[in-house]
Amino acid sequence: MATWKNLDTLETFKALSEVKRVKLAEVMSGAEGAERVKKYSVPMAEGFSYNFAAKQVDDEVLNALKALAEEAELAEKFEELYNGAVINTGENRLVLHQLTRGQLGNAVEADGVDKREFYVKQQARIAEFANKVHNGEITNAAGEKFTTVVQIGIGGSDLGPRAMYLALENWAKKNNTLKMKAQFISNVDPDDAAAVLNAVDVAHALFVLVSKSGTTLETLTNESFVKEALKKAGLDASKHMIAVTSEISPLAKSDDYLAAFFMDDNIGGRFSSTSAVGGAVLSLAFGPDVFAQFLEGAAAEDKLSANKNVMENPEMLDALIGVYERNVLGYPGTAVLPYSQALSRFPAHLQQLDMESNGKSVNRFGEPVDYPTGPVIFGEPGTNGQHSFYQLLHQGTDIVPLQFVGFRNSQIGTDIEIQGSTSQQKLCANVAAQIVAFACGKSDDNRNKNFEGGRPSSIIIGDSLTPKSLGALLAHFENKIMFQGFLWNVNSFDQEGVQLGKVLAKRVLAHETDGALKVYSDLLNI
C-alpha cells in the first residue's frame, strides 16, 4: 500500500525547492524559445497535446518533479483508487467516477454490487428512456413530444452538466444531433426558476431533478417551484419529471416521477458529469450515442493518467508543475482561459472541481498542514478575458499561472475572411500572442508600458471540440486535481466547507438566531 505523507516531509520536495529558478523571459526568447515549444509537449487523448514550454521549468526542474512523483507514489495511489481502495477517508468511501467511463483495473465491488456493472446498467437505462422520449413512445399527456429538458440541481449537479451541454450544443446543431434544448435551474433565488419557466413551454418540457440524498434544500425548493408552475398550467407534474438520485433516497421509489436513475455515494457531485447526473440531461439533449462518445474520450484520457512515466502522463505532469508553482514559486491562483466560446462555463465548473476538492487546510488524517494547498481558480473564454482581467495578469503585482485551451478549428465551421485572415485564425493568433507576451514581456522606458514578462502558462491544443475531445479535456482536469490532492496529502473528495453555512441557514429560517446572525437576518427581512 502507498504511504501518505505531507508534502513538506518529502525529501524530493526539499530538493525541488533548491533547484535553480528558470528565467522564463530568457528561455522563451529567440531560437531557444522556439526549440522549447517543440520539445516541451506531451500527447493527450483525442488529438490533444499538453504544451508546457512557457512554464518555469527546464530539464533540471522536470527531473526533480519526476523524483517527487516517485516518492509521493502518485501512480500507486491512483492505482489503489481505481482498484477500489477507500480514498475518501473523511466519509469512508471509495472514489469511482473514473469507473463510470471505463475499467482501468480490477473489478470493484461495494455492498455486494459490481460497480462498473451498476454504472453501465444506469447508462443503458437512461439510453433506453431517452430513445423512447425521442421517438415519441414517452410523451406528455396530450401525446405530444417533449422538446425541452430542464435540469434542476445545484453545485456538481448543475455546473458540470451545464458546462458540458453548452460545450456541445453548437456541435450538436451542426451535426444534427440536437434532440432537445436544455435549460438549467440551480439557484434558490426565485428569479432563476422563474426566468427559465418563462422561457420554456412547460407543456412540452421534461424536468430532471438531481439530488443524491433527495433532501437538498435548494433543489427541492426549486422542484416545488416547478411543480406549482406545472399545476397552474393544468399539468400533472409526475408526467413531466424524472429523478436522478441514490437508490436509498426518498425520491427513488416515489410516484412523483416518470422514472428514477441512480447514482451512489462513491461519486462526488463535482465529479459526476460522466455519471447519471450528466448522463440523463446530455442523453436527452443530444442522444445516448453522443454521451457514449463523451465517456469514450474521458476513458481514453484516464488510461494516460495511469502511466507511471511522468513525461507520458499529461495529468500528472500538469499537477506536478502546478504544485511547484504553488508551493515553491508561491503563486496564489490559476486562470483557466479557453479560447472557445463553447467552453464559456468550463472555467466555472473547474472552479468548483478544483477549489472544492483541494481547498483544505488539514491533511487526510485531520492534522493542520503548514503549506499552501489549492489555488484560487477563475477564468473566462478568450478573447473576452483579454478585455477584462488580463491587465492584472500582465502587469499586476501577483504572478498568476495561466492554463490556455485552444483549437485549430471552430465547431460550427461558419467563418469569414477579413483583412487576410478568418475569425478562427484571429482567435488562434491571439492565444499564441498572449502566451509569448506573458512569458517574454516587452521593455519600455515608460514604466507604465513596460511588461516584465516571466508570467508562466501552458496550453492544451486540440483540433476541434467534439464529444470525445470534451471527455478527454474533462478527465485531464479531474485527474490533475486528484494528483495534486495526493501531493498535498489532502482528501480531495469531501467538502465539509459547504456544510456550516447550510446549518446556519436552517437556523435562520427557523428563527433560532442570536447575536450577529440575528441582526443580519433582520437586515434581510427574514
Positions of PLM-derived features:
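Glycine-rich phosphate-binding loops that contact phosphosugars or nucleotide phosphates
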Residues: 128-136, 142-308, 507-510
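C-terminal helical/tail subdomains of lipid-metabolizing enzymes
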Residues: 458-526
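General structural feature for long, well-ordered alpha-helical segments within catalytic domains
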Residues: 12, 36, 57-65, 77, ...
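Short glycine-rich or small-residue beta-strand-to-loop segments that form or flank ligand, phosphate
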Residues: 147-155, 207-213, 333-340, 377, ...
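Short, solvent-exposed amphipathic alpha-helical segments in soluble enzyme
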Residues: 164-169, 198-202, 224-226, 258, ...
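Acidic, Ser/Thr-rich peripheral helices and adjacent loops at domain boundaries
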Residues: 414-449
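Active-site phosphate/pyrophosphate-binding segments
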Residues: 229-414, 453, 500-526
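Extended, charge-enriched "interface" segments that sit outside catalytic cores
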Residues: 4-142, 420-428, 439-440, 462, ...
